[in-house]
């Protein structure tokens, strides 16, 4: 979890084979309406995100039901979003990829993304509710290190039960 540009996709893809999990990019689960809205530089509302979050939760529960592990890259910016994702899934774990606005802005302006312009980064930081101590299923990882170091730190956290 984390704002756009925090490395969710890159880290998720690198971590998945390490922990024998399927990688699913939550960006690919957005409705066309949401994609069009973001491409136009319009931030998503809670209502816009609801169906997307419900689909992500469903995909996660399906993996649990089949006894398989998955990594779903998803912003999960608010605690209420994370709570929705936790519904009927006691095995869910979150990895919060934490970085400063300046670091992530620098990254996001150097990449090409199909629909997420750098102008929306501020709205993501404005929406972000960083996980607190009451969210025991969240591990916070600083992204101010290399991809292999981040993957190693997550793998050592032993999130798969």
Q: Where are the model-predicted features located?
A:
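P-loop (Walker A) phosphate-binding loop of NTP-binding proteins
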Residues: 3
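Conserved beta-strand scaffold positions in the cores of enzyme catalytic domains, especially
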Residues: 23, 28, 94, 138-140
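Conserved phosphate-donor/acceptor-positioning beta-strand/loop module used by diverse small-molecule
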Residues: 88-107
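Conserved nucleotide-binding/hydrolysis micro-motifs of P-loop NTPases
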Residues: 29-30, 76-78, 99-103, 146
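Glycine-rich phosphate-binding loop used to anchor ATP phosphates in small-molecule kinases
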Residues: 47-88, 97
């Amino acid at each position: 979890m984390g704002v756009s540009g925090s490395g969710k996709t890159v880290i998720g893809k690198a971590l998945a084979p390490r922990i024998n999990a399927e990688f699913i990019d939550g960006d690919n689960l957005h409705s066309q309406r949401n994609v069009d809205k973001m491409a136009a530089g319009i931030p998503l509302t809670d209502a816009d995100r609801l169906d997307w979050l419900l689909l992500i939760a469903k995909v996660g529960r399906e993996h649990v039901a089949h006894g398989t592990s998955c990594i779903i890259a998803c912003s999960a910016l608010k605690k209420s979003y994370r709570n929705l994702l936790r519904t009927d899934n006691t095995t869910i774990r979150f990895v919060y990829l934490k970085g400063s606005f300046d670091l992530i802005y620098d990254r996001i302006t150097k990449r090409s993304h199909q629909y997420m312009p750098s102008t929306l980064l501020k709205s993501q930081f404005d929406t972000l509710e960083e996980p607190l101590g009451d969210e025991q299923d969240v591990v916070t990882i600083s992204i101010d290190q290399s991809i292999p170091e981040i993957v190693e730190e997550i793998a050592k956290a032993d999130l798969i039960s």
